[in-house]
Amino acid sequence: MASAQSFYNQSSVLKINVMVVDDDHVFLDIMSRMLQHSKYRVIAVDDPKKALSTLKIQRDNIDLIITDYYMPGMNGLQLKKQITQEFGNLPVLVMSSDTNKEEESLSCGAMGFIPKPIHPTDLTKIYQFALSNKRNGKSTLSTEQNHKDADVSVPQQITLVPEQADVLKTKRKNCSFKSDSRTVNSTNGSCVSTDGSRKNRKRKPNGGPSDDGESMSQPAKKKKIQWTDSLHDLFLQAIRHIGLDKAVPKKILAFMSVPYLTRENVASHLQKYRIFLRRVAEQGLYSMLSDRGIDSMFRQTHIKEPYFNYYTPSTSWYDTRLNNRSFYSKPVHGFGQSKLLSTTREPVCFNQMPYNYMNRSSTYEPHRIGSGSNLTLPIQSNLSFPNQPSQNEERRSFFEPPVMANKIAQTSQVLGFGQLGPSAISGHNFNNNMTSRYGSLIPSQPGPSHFSYGMQSFLNNENVTYNPQPPANATTQPNLDELPQLENLNLYNDFGNTSELPYNISNFQFDDNKHQQGEADPTKFELPAAKFSTELNHEDDGDWTFVNINQGQSNGETSNTIASPETNTPILNINHNQNQGQDVPEFNDWSFLDPQELVDDDFMNSLFNNDMN
């Protein structure tokens, strides 16, 4: 029996057109009434061949086909295959009281399986299959006017009846879906999907039907930004320009001006950079980043002011014989050095570094001699000799730089000891331009300039001659009153027996206005107790006056020549060959004098004043 049933509700509400095919007339009538009660439009057919004929006529008015599995002449699966060949992919549901046919039905392309008897809850499953087919554009809306059918195109917005609004939405099941993913509820006969059915759902490609019937186009995946070294350097420049505390992705992006960068890229990189800095701070590696660093692309991104070590000595500027000289010393006059070394040709560049960076040692204790003296007396604690280890890690200068107003000193690197004029050294030109810049000494001429070498030259009694070129009518009187008495100076034991002198030379005075026309009477005396001899020689050479004082020990002789030049620009000559061409004056023997008389100040003053005049 084939008859067209009218709608239960005659209003023009969206209807689902369902064709029911079953050879059992009783079940076909019950099924049709249930669907009509749920606002379906039902076409009931009792033969598979009639169903094919009806489809040829009302193909566009049928949204879903429900067929029984067991039918004479053609079973439900054969009907499904024939419909697919002739009319395309129409949704077909298979009904059967034999639940073993579920797997076979699904594997052959059926959209679903409904076990008999039908339960009202199964009607919702029927609706979801039909609605999915309608949204694919294959269904029509039928409105009954005067009991006649009219085809109307389905609008995009579908209005659902209240009974169909709460229907769940599922996908089309694959043909290879297994029966163990579904269980049959024996109480109500309904087929309930397990958790595995939802997990096995696959997302359909773009443009195809989805869960809610709408094509869901996935957004294109953003291209990953590769932070190269140049791009990272630009990022660091932006950080330095803006400041780490005020750096935000918007400002950094504006500073970098890279077209393909986004705020998300910069924000992600900035977050990684701050995490890197936090990790560095926790490990306490800020001081080691310049050498070792952390294995990261942020290895050069710790932001701080550049550190300049102005105080690291560079031994490449010096000869190896200068190892014991302080690199932080200032240019100073030697101990006992007179003002005869003053010149106006080249200035003394004192150390321009602040004292708070110099790491001055507590053992550096200068002792001033006199109120107007430019000399500084060293103490034993801050004298460094080869055989005596220094108390400090860094060797310091022996003397504090003299405070001189408009005075210019040109001295050698040797800090002389017990000098009244130039330092007594050998093999080194005294006109050695020496300046101190930024805490280090830069000699312009190589040579032995060690303090110990100067003292060794003093003890070895090497002959040195001082030959200036003074202009006429010039007088220079060294301030000898400010010289300390050497008997109070106790040096290290390596100096030998030179810590005490048998006479006081503080009253030496030179009068250069009086020139001697002939050779002065030479005087010679010898002190056996002190094991040294002193030779005084007054020598006339034009407008020059020389005083030779020779002090000797058993191991050698040392000659200090003191002159009173009449010029402001003295020239120091330490050429031994020059002394050979000069006449050697004769000396008188002073050995008959009493050593106690030599110690007497009045006797020595009268003796030297008479010789000078």
Swiss-Prot record:
Disruption phenotype: No visible phenotype. This is Putative two-component response regulator ARR21. Residues 17-131 form the Response regulatory domain. InterPro entries: ARR-like (IPR045279), CheY-like_superfamily (IPR011006), Homeodomain-like_sf (IPR009057), Myb_dom (IPR017930), Myb_dom_plants (IPR006447), Response_reg_B-typ_pln (IPR017053), Sig_transdc_resp-reg_receiver (IPR001789). Two-component system major event consists of a His-to-Asp phosphorelay between a sensor histidine kinase (HK) and a response regulator (RR). In plants, the His-to-Asp phosphorelay involves an additional intermediate named Histidine-containing phosphotransfer protein (HPt). This multistep phosphorelay consists of a His-Asp-His-Asp sequential transfer of a phosphate group between first a His and an Asp of the HK protein, followed by the transfer to a conserved His of the HPt protein and finally the transfer to an Asp in the receiver domain of the RR protein. It comes from Arabidopsis thaliana (Mouse-ear cress). Mainly expressed in siliques. Also found in germinating seedlings, stems, flowers and roots, but not in rosette leaves. The gene is ARR21. Keywords: Activator, Cytokinin signaling pathway, DNA-binding, Nucleus, Phosphoprotein, Transcription, Transcription regulation, Two-component regulatory system.
